[in-house]
Amino acid sequence: MVAEAGSMPAASSVKKPFGLRSKMGKWCRHCFAWCRGSGKSNVGTSGDHDDSAMKTLRSKMGKWCCHCFPWCRGSGKSNVGTSGDHDDSAMKTLRSKMGKWCCHCFPCCRGSGKSNVGTSGDHDDSAMKTLRSKMGKWCCHCFPCCRGSGKNKVGPWGDYDDSAFMEPRYHVRREDLDKLHRAAWWGKVPRKDLIVMLKDTDMNKKDKQKRTALHLASANGNSEVVKLLLDRRCQLNILDNKKRTALTKAVQCQEDECALMLLEHGTDPNIPDEYGNTALHYAIYNEDKLMAKALLLYGADIESKNKHGLTPLLLGVHEQKQQVVKFLIKKKANLNALDRYGRTALILAVCCGSASIVSLLLEQNIDVSSQDLSGQTAREYAVSSRHNVICQLLSDYKEKQILKVSSENSNPEQDLKLTSEEESQRLKGSENSQPEEMSQEPEINKGGDRKVEEEMKKHGSTHMGFPENLTNGATADNGDDGLIPPRKSRTPESQQFPDTENEQYHSDEQNDTQKQLSEEQNTGILQDEILIHEEKQIEVAENEF
């Protein structure tokens, strides 16, 4: 069935999707030939889409958009998680550039740089040049900006879907559970009846979803049932169909009381589920700091990674959970951990546009020059995403680091230079002071000699004679023997006869010190002798007159 060019087939003539899949081949259903019968695309020269022929197929799609509808490419799989929910708010940036054109007609859809219609389709490619250059080989489904990440050529941001964290509680149907599982889930059975059930039934029995009574009771917060099962020593680390333990479900469902009881009885907190998440990942996602602290206390690995390579810290940054990120930093989480694309916590924070988390990470002296697998740094992502506040934060941090490094390099050299200059000045000063002290001593001695000579000339002789009676009378009062004591030599005995032994045993420095002390003592002795001699000469002269 091929319609004539320019005509549209009736909606009733459209085949069901199951028959359509085999005919689609490489064409997606929007471009499938029968949509317009042209063999090219479902748009005409006006560029308008006529979706009237798609009503039957659309009714089958339900909540799935055309991107993720399993029959879109005949793959039978969707491009997002099992929930199929699209965050349309994240598409605003791309939609604003696309105008009225859908992503299937968007010139960069196939990475070819051309539209999927002829030149008559009136596609305005000029408006798409900037975006097209960033998209590279990625089609609009996988282009990172579709998820609001602002990244390119690293991997689809859609890989970081939250499907693992969606719908944490079990979907339970009564007909799928036996008596023990019903009692564990609803918890309305009296304790006595529950004890009887445990005697008659295997407490570790699994239902169709591989859930035990402990799984159901923990996920629904029935702490009394959990306590009874633990007292009966049930198995703690059994996995359900998602490879989750009862502890993981309790943490995921934020049933802290049940989780603490399981930890106290020795449940392993590091068992990953099919997504690679541990109980700590779910505690961080829920921003449950108390539960995260308890898990770390019982040995949870703070550096465990899920299938995306996200540690609890990277997960907290990706989900913009600022409080738990701050908590993990205090617990010494590795700030340089990398996800599977080589992205650090700082790069993830920049890509998410979280200035507060970027500022928090910069306070920890994190490496801002780290590159991911595509060779991009945090600053390059900030510039390409036009996060002006984050760009300013990174620039300020870089300037501070440059000033810090320059100050650390300059201070030691200046201090060493100043110290050497001060030391040289001190040595020069000590050398100059010693000759001055030595030169002052002869001047003092010469001054004393001049006074004696002047006094002797005053009395007319340099050689004065004294009568015996005057001499005896003058000295009687002092208790002397009547003789004027002979004048002592100016040079002390120690200088007249130097001790050669001392010179041999003392170092040069010690000899210099002793020499200075002896010279000072000699100077004082000579001055005293001169004064005494002068006084006695004056007294003798007065008695003669």
UniProtKB/Swiss-Prot annotation:
UniProt feature, compositional bias: Basic and acidic residues: 414-429, 443-458
Keyword list, A-Z: ANK repeat, Repeat
SMART domains, A to Z: ANK (SM00248)
InterPro entries tied to this protein: Ankyrin_repeat_domain (IPR050657), Ankyrin_rpt (IPR002110), Ankyrin_rpt-contain_sf (IPR036770)
Stretch list, region Disordered: 406-524
Keyword flag Repeat: yes
Annotated ANK repeat ranges: 180-208, 209-238, 242-271, 275-304, 308-337, 341-370, 374-404
Polar residues composition bias: residue spans: 513-524
Keyword Repeat: yes
Family statement drawn from the similarity comment of this UniProt entry: Belongs to the POTE family.
Name of the protein described by the UniProt record: POTE ankyrin domain family member H
Organism annotation: Homo sapiens (Human)
Lineage start: Eukaryota, Metazoa, Chordata, Craniata, Vertebrata
